[in-house]
Amino acid sequence: MNLVFLWAALGGAIGSSLRYFVGKMMPSKFLMFESFPLGTFSVNLIGCFIIGFMGHLAAKKVFGDDFGIFFVTGVLGGFTTFSSYGLDTLKLLQKSQYLEAISYVLGTNLLGLIGVAIGWFLAKNFVGVN
């Protein structure tokens, strides 16, 4: 029996549970904003960093395909929340919270890209996998 789907599902359950936990731990008031989806924002940035790190290791074949499916597809797929990101942005726009919406979109994308680059750099330079 092919366990690929089981690995992805198990990882997805873990990632989704972690996403829910992080989301519940974050306050809704953030910096100057009364309502900011900080939980989703944080999860996306953490996920971007981790996928950058793991992406480099996967490219260098540091771990097998089963672990990659479990962790990258499953755990990170369940953990990161770009679908929730779209919904959160729409809700901010619907409430006419334009500054929050723009800050959320720009912050998630710019800091997410930076997180991926830092994760990749650290995996490449400090884990010893070149």
Curated annotation (Swiss-Prot):
Query: GO biological process: any one?
Result: cellular detoxification of fluoride
Transmembrane spans: 3-23, 38-58, 67-87, 102-122
Instruction: Output the Gene Ontology terms for molecular function.
Output: fluoride channel activity; metal ion binding
User: Where found in the cell?
Assistant: Cell inner membrane
- Coarsely, its chief localization is membrane
Description of activity control: Na(+) is not transported, but it plays an essential structural role and its presence is essential for fluoride channel function.
Which positions bind Na(+)? G77, T80
Membrane topology note: Multi-pass membrane protein
> Which GO cellular component does the record give, naming just one?
plasma membrane
Transmembrane as a keyword?
yes
What Pfam families does the record point to? Answer: CRCB (PF02537)
Swiss-Prot/TrEMBL catalytic activity: fluoride(in) = fluoride(out)
Query: According to the lineage, what is the superkingdom?
Result: Bacteria
**Which spans of this chain does the record mark as coiled coil?**
none
Per the entry, what this protein does is: Fluoride-specific ion channel. Important for reducing fluoride concentration in the cell, thus reducing its toxicity.
User: Can you tell me which family this protein belongs to?
Assistant: Belongs to the fluoride channel Fluc/FEX (TC 1.A.43) family.
User: Which protein is depicted?
Assistant: Fluoride-specific ion channel FluC
* Organism, scientific name: Helicobacter pylori (strain J99 / ATCC 700824) (Campylobacter pylori J99)
Q: Which gene encodes it?
A: fluC
